[in-house]
């Protein structure tokens, strides 16, 4: 099972983003699953873009519903607490804590993360996630 992180999903949904076609192609035919936190991050980013590039939250939600018909994957409360403990013990901070949540969710559900964000590597490795990094 493959699950895109925000660095793949945002360009896949937004034609104005560099890498749009590449991200769409990477997801095509793979029946990707959606991590709940990635859905929130993606909706947040795309709905606060500059005028002309911005997408309405309802438009993003509709795209997510269409592209990810299966139930989203998430951590239960106990696993979220364990994730934060592991992330803090690994020395992660700031935005890397969100990367840790995404990675832990993928690991918990047996998914491989599809990412274009090599900056998240430390967090993904600290959480023990399998990651497929996009080329380019």
Labelled PLM ranges:
Residues 34-40, 101:
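Aromatic- and histidine-enriched alpha-helix N-cap/loop-to-helix transition segments
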